[in-house]
């Protein structure tokens, strides 16, 4: 945690937010365990005091919507003393009830869709946005993380998907619902350098502006040296469509 803060200071940040992946009902390689939560919060408190004269710090969590029992709005997450919460979807249940991680490289995504969903990409895309919409309805978070993260993998699986009318209508309805609830949408720059895409896809930036959705540029960096990656490109793209950055 301290390495991220030091790097943020060296990059000239005036404020910075720390947000680990929140615990899930099962262990993964990339989520925190509940027995580490107190350490996470106390270490942040120590660092906030240590660097108070250099940078404004905030503490949060990125919390998955998994099902009706595990999502950002449940009391266990709401009771935590956090400054902000990010809501996101990384996993889906297959028809057989298996949890499938769909936030993978595109080649692995293809294998998973074929193995667990019989190659039915339309079903997977609809399920993904259904879960996102349910998370929006339940609430309990401030920022919607990588709002259409699946778009890259899905369009690699089936090139041209983003131009299909049903997909465009699905995404537009989704953003309209986000606007109705007043959430901030993260402009996620994590993949821009390597894949040339933001999340959400920049084709929807004008819609976000039209709907009056507030946005926040985030790096989603898992390594300190990447916290400022593609920020300038994201801000320039937002400015082109009328956002005041």
Task: Label the model's feature ranges.
Residues 14-15, 19, 83, 142, ...:
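Short acidic/polar active-site loop segments enriched in Thr and Asp
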Residues 1-67, 72, 77-79, 151-165, ...:
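An N-terminally biased module of ancient metal coordination in phosphate/nucleic-acid-related enzymes
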Residues 8, 85, 146, 185, ...:
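Conserved, mostly hydrophobic/aromatic
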Residues 130-133, 138, 203, 236-241:
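C-terminal functional module detector
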Residues 169-172, 187-217, 229-232:
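Extended hydrophobic/aromatic segments used for targeting, binding, or gating
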Residues 19-20, 145, 185-190, 216-219:
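Short beta-strands and strand-loop turn motifs
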Residues 37-180:
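Extended substrate/RNA-proximal surfaces in nucleic-acid metabolism proteins
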């Amino acid at each position: 945690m301290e390495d991220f803060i030091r790097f943020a200071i060296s990059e000239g940040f005036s404020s910075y937010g720390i947000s680990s992946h929140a615990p899930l009902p099962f262990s993964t390689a990339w989520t925190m365990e509940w027995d580490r939560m107190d350490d996470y919060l106390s270490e942040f408190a120590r660092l906030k005091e240590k660097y108070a004269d250099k940078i404004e710090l905030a503490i949060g969590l990125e919390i998955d919507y998994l099902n009706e029992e595990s999502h950002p709005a449940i009391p266990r997450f709401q009771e935590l003393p956090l400054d902000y919460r990010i809501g996101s979807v990384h996993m889906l249940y297959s028809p057989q009830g298996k949890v499938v991680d769909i936030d993978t490289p595109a080649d692995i995504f293809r294998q998973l869709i074929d193995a667990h969903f019989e190659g039915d990409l339309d079903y997977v895309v609809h399920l993904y946005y259904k879960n996102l919409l349910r998370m929006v309805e339940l609430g309990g978070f401030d920022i919607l993380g990588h709002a259409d993260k699946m778009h890259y993998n899905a369009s690699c699986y089936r090139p041209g998907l983003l131009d299909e009318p049903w997909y465009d209508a699905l995404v537009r309805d989704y953003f309209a619902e986000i606007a109705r609830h007043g959430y901030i949408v993260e402009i996620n720059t994590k993949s821009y350098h390597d894949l040339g895409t933001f999340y959400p896809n920049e084709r929807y930036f004008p819609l976000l502006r039209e709907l009056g959705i507030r946005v926040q540029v985030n790096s989603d960096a898992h390594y300190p040296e990447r916290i400022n990656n593609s920020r300038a490109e994201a801000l320039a793209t937002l400015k082109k469509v009328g956002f005041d950055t």
